[in-house]
């Protein structure tokens, strides 16, 4: 096989379809709770703070399990690793539907954090192994990173408009949504089981040594990308977990209307995630990130200060936050210290640090919303975080501009 053939293996898009299916279902299960927050709080007797703690449960586990999951992906391979992750995510969805109180509800959501890292680290490793051409690789990153958002968007739309009226039960709704992962597992089992050997090398070239965890952490560029991941997750999980409730309680929308407007924001994020990474050259990554952060800050602040009738526009602007994830993932994959043989470890470390933001986002916003500041104060806090993230984004220029000068 020539180098060109290796970069364009005919099976790469078939395998990629299976990855996208699992990642889509990942988003469905992850987002199964936020549209139903009101019903679940009433049924289980949870305060906003307790619900925020539960929403961040799987991110707490991610902090510990992500490095382990990354190493498992490197050792088990993407076929078995992603399959194992999908099984655990399915179990999480079923167990959360059977919760009877805060403790069991928290544990059920936390279980998601055990299987999730295998999926989230397996997807970029597969892209690194099967997509050698830079533009195709960036396109693949943009596509698969939108799958959780699309899955979450579908959950937002169908939970209150179709499934809740059909079943009359938040528990049955969660079970049905978990069934999407069962279907995705079946597809992945078939397409990955028939896959040939990946065209890209999974071991370092002869005479070189794979960069391990210590080597990755010694890279200042890698550490900067870790910091960006923390901020992106704080914003993404914080707004993703609470935005439907913000529009219901702060702006006065119905549950269905709130879910639909949040889904619109998700659609904006999906389009941006597909377009921006592919068209953004490495030296322009900081500029693209800065523009998105400013837009998100303006959007969430506008929900607080502008008339409610303009909220859909503000929510759409805030939806651009989804495009930050693929941009940061591109920066991670193109870091000097990251290579195919250590992709799992690198992404495991990244998710471990990033999910600190994923944990604190829903928790902090929930706590702030429980105070006299309400959801307005919580949204202004998100805007402040966006502004603060402009500092590490600016520092990233020294790495992207360095590559431009080579």
Which residues fall in each region the model found?
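Juxtamembrane intracellular "pre-TM" segments in multi-pass secondary transporters
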Residues: 2-9, 195-225
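Residue-level signature of mid-helix packing/kink "hotspots" within the transmembrane helices
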Residues: 31, 59-67, 153, 266-274, ...
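Extracytoplasmic gate region of multi-pass secondary transporters
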Residues: 33-34, 221-263, 270-273
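Conserved MFS/SLC helix-loop-helix module at the cytosolic interface between two early adjacent transmembrane helices
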Residues: 64-100
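Helix-loop-helix hairpin linking two adjacent transmembrane segments in secondary transporters
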Residues: 102, 143-193
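Cytoplasmic helix-loop-helix junction between adjacent transmembrane helices
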Residues: 109-147
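C-terminal transmembrane helical hairpin of 12-TM major facilitator-type secondary transporters
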Residues: 284-331
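A late C-terminal transmembrane helix in Major Facilitator Superfamily
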Residues: 340-372
């Amino acid at each position: 096989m020539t180098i060109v053939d290796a970069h364009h293996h005919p099976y790469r898009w078939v395998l990629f379809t299976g990855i996208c299916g699992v990642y889509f279902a990942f988003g469905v299960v992850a987002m199964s709770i936020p549209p139903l927050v009101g019903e679940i709080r009433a049924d289980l007797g949870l305060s906003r703070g307790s619900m925020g703690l539960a929403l961040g449960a799987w991110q707490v586990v991610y902090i510990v399990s992500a490095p382990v999951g990354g190493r498992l992906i490197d050792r088990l391979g993407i076929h078995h690793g992603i399959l194992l992750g999908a099984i655990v995510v399915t179990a999480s969805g079923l167990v959360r539907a059977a919760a009877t109180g805060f403790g069991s509800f928290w544990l059920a959501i936390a279980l998601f954090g055990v299987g999730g890292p295998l999926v989230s680290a397996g997807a970029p490793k597969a892209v690194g192994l099967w997509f050698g051409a830079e533009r195709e690789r960036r396109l693949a990153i943009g596509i698969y990173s939108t799958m959780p958002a699309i899955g979450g968007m579908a959950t937002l739309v169908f939970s209150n408009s179709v499934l809740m009226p059909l079943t009359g039960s938040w528990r049955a709704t969660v079970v049905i949504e978990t069934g999407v992962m069962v279907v995705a597992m079946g597809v992945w089992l078939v397409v990955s089981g028939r896959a040939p050997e990946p065209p890209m090398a999974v071991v370092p070239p002869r005479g070189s040594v794979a960069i391990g965890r210590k080597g990755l952490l010694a890279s200042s560029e890698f550490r900067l990308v870790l910091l960006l991941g923390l901020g992106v997750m704080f914003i993404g999980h914080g707004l993703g977990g609470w935005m439907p409730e913000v529009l219901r309680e702060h702006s006065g929308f119905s549950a269905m209307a709130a879910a639909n407007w949040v889904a619109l924001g998700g659609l904006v994020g999906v389009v941006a995630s597909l377009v921006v990474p592919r068209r953004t050259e490495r030296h322009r990554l900081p500029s693209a990130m800065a523009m998105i952060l400013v837009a998100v800050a303006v959007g969430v602040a506008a929900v607080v200060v502008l008339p409610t009738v303009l909220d859909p526009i503000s929510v759409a602007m805030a939806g651009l936050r989804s495009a930050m994830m693929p941009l940061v993932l591109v920066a991670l994959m193109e870091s000097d210290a990251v290579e195919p043989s250590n992709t799992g470890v690198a992404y495991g470390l990244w998710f471990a640090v990033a999910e600190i933001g994923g944990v604190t986002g829903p928790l902090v916003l929930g706590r702030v919303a429980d105070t006299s500041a309400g959801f307005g104060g919580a949204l202004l806090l998100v805007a402040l975080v966006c502004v603060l993230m402009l500092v590490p984004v600016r520092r990233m220029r020294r790495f992207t501009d360095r590559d431009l000068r080579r």
